[in-house]
Amino acid sequence: MKKLTALFNLPELKNDIELHNMVLDSRKVKAGDLFVAIKGHQVDGNQFIDSALHSGASAVVSETELSSEHLTVEFIGNVPVVKYHQLARHLSSLADVFYDSPSKNLTLVGVTGTNGKTTISQLLAQWAELLGHRAAVMGTIGNGLFRQIVEAKNTTGSAVEIQSSLSTFKHAGADFTSIEVSSHGLAQHRVEALHFKAAIFTNLTRDHLDYHQSMENYAAAKKRLFTELDTQIKVINADDEIGYQWLTELPDAIAVSMNADFKVGSHQWMKAINIHYHFKGADITFESSWGNGVLHSPLIGAFNVSNLLLVMTTLLSFGYPLENLLATAKSLKGVCGRMEMIQYPNKPTVIVDYAHTPDALEKALIAAREHCQGELWCIFGCGGDRDRGKRPLMAQIAEQFAEKIIVTKDNPRTEPQSQIEADIVAGFKNMEKVGIIPDRAQAIQFAIESAVENDVILIAGKGHEHYQIIGSEVVHFSDQEIALDFLK
């Protein structure tokens, strides 16, 4: 329970209005809640104030475009409506007060970058548990205490959802939380009032340009986590061009590299000296500001070496002994839908991965190649109603790194599948090794029945998702389930 006057110390407000929850969706309002009416990109919450009042809201905070109306109060019946200028920008701070600053009582790590956020946030929570913590995670796969994750709608939830979830985690006994921080979440100030013990930057490649319009805007949104928010420790991938540039501007940041020739400067640092890849993962010989050693990784692919080094560096910066981390690393498990290997005797190996950008697809194919003795197959599509510019680029990547390619459905949404396919096909130089099978299950079936034992089939784009969005309908679909059916 929180008194309304704890949020707004205004003379018009009585001291006896107690609130249960902050709620953005009028359909979820219950008696005693504070309804937050924000002007969103598609819907204006002010249109639903009457609905919220009908459901029993005890108070409303309403976004106004007029600065002169800021913190003025009007009443609808006995219910106060507090006008708030630039409410969306300040909502994280209001929710922080409402939920008693939960991030101050947690070790909170934010992870941002185009690729690797999910793997890193899941590994952080998993490793924290191995070190004796009660960990929680928020991101693409879902939110919740580790191993009790509930599916999420967005990578980074609303400002209210984030603070509310962190409060729930804290009261459930969590003392460590990792959170994926998307560029949308940063640009829209959804994580503004969080207190980060550390933030990790993975990489920056083309994605979300339908929203950000330019790579410069996209990079600027990501950078806010390291320059404008309350972030104590900054861990940055020095092998990324943008990351390397940021390191020159952030003298207190920690540099992480897979390059043995990386020149160590004034930063704290971690670098791989030698990497031996094998079918069960990789053995990483490293040097660092905290000592040297060999890290045995259970994850496949070069990019997962980078992911794991970023995670270990973060934990070292918190003061965990190197020997404890090396001992517990052997117990780490892979992440659902992230280079997830499915194998049956005498059948081709199937790898399911979430790769849905040109850079992620390239990294996934290179990683799959390391485990392929025969031909490498690539099954992929592109989401509808999203950045069309990346479609031919993904075709070029597939053609460069795979012997056999099948173009299929991803989540076409409301865009004609034929248009998506045409955009992809425009990127191929030669169609000889390309097949188009729109039905995704049939595409997977064809590849598994056509490939031989030493071949590897990468099914890219959906990863952990167990649905397809076709038109406005969401239908059940799992790459893993389909692959298992045809491998048996």
Swiss-Prot record:
Chain positions of motif Meso-diaminopimelate recognition motif: 410-413
Modification after translation (UniProt): Carboxylation is probably crucial for Mg(2+) binding and, consequently, for the gamma-phosphate positioning of ATP.
GO molecular function term, any single one: UDP-N-acetylmuramoylalanyl-D-glutamate-2,6-diaminopimelate ligase activity
Keywords associated with the record: ATP-binding, Cell cycle, Cell division, Cell shape, Cell wall biogenesis/degradation, Cytoplasm, Ligase, Magnesium, Nucleotide-binding, Peptidoglycan synthesis
Gene Ontology cellular component list: cytoplasm
InterPro entries: Mur-like_cat_sf, Mur_ligase_C, Mur_ligase_C_dom_sf, Mur_ligase_cen, Mur_ligase_N, MurE/MurF_N, UDP-N-AcMur-Glu-dNH2Pim_ligase
Cofactor list: Mg(2+)
Residue numbers binding ATP: 113-119
Pathway(s) annotated for this protein in UniProt: Cell wall biogenesis; peptidoglycan biosynthesis
Pfam families given in the database record: Mur_ligase, Mur_ligase_C, Mur_ligase_M
Protein name: UDP-N-acetylmuramoyl-L-alanyl-D-glutamate--2,6-diaminopimelate ligase
Originating species: Haemophilus influenzae (strain PittGG)
Species lineage: Bacteria, Pseudomonadati, Pseudomonadota, Gammaproteobacteria, Pasteurellales
